[in-house]
Regions:
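Surface-exposed, charged secondary-structure patches
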Residues: 67-110
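Short beta-strand edge/turn micro-motifs at domain boundaries
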Residues: 114-143
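A mature extracytoplasmic/lumenal domain signature
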Residues: 46, 56, 100-104, 119, ...
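Short, low-complexity N-terminal intrinsically disordered segments enriched in polar/charged residues
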Residues: 12-39, 44
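Hydrophobic pocket/interface hotspot
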Residues: 30, 41-42, 50, 98, ...
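Sec-dependent N-terminal signal peptides
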Residues: 3-14
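A short gly/proline-enriched turn/hairpin at secondary-structure junctions
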Residues: 46-61, 76
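Detector for glycine-centered tight turns/loop "hinges" at secondary-structure junctions
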Residues: 56-57, 109, 126
Length: 143
């Protein structure tokens, strides 16, 4: 019940999806899947392979789910993430780039970290999928 209340609260803070482009709405949905720790939905919402660039290191994962370790994230104190800024930088028929500023929070709603990430989206059969994440600075997915 606590997690359901948290998800509903977070949903109320996000921008109205009718105000967002399709790639921006896909980013919002991706964060909802992340907060729900729904690896299957995260994999379905991302391209393969998934490229993660952070702290000067570029890693290629077969799927987004392979890059994640929710247990390690929770051990670091992570309880949920919230988007603060969701800005479309570029979009054509096949690709888009979205600049996201977000924070990770602990269970007391204290900020653990705030990050800026540019996500590259690809349009596959009408669905926008996150293909790559370019982090300004350091950020971990738990691995």
């Amino acid at each position: 019940m606590k997690h359901l209340s948290l998800i509903l609260l977070l949903a109320s803070f996000t921008a109205n999806s009718s105000d967002l482009s399709a790639p921006q709405a896909a980013a919002e949905k991706f964060f909802r899947y992340f907060n729900a720790k729904d690896i299957e939905s995260l994999n379905n919402a991302s391209g393969r392979p998934f490229i993660f660039a952070a702290g000067g290191e570029v890693i290629r994962w077969n799927s987004y789910g392979e890059a994640l370790d929710f247990e390690a994230l929770e051990e670091s104190g992570w309880a949920y993430s919230r988007i603060h800024q969701n800005e479309l930088i570029y979009k054509d028929d096949m690709t888009a780039m979205v600049d996201i500023n977000f924070s990770r929070y602990d269970s007391t709603d204290a900020v653990i970290t705030t990050s800026d990430v540019i996500y590259l989206f690809v349009n596959r059969d009408g669905a926008w999928k996150i293909k790559s994440a370019f982090v300004k600075g350091n950020l971990t997915l738990g691995r």
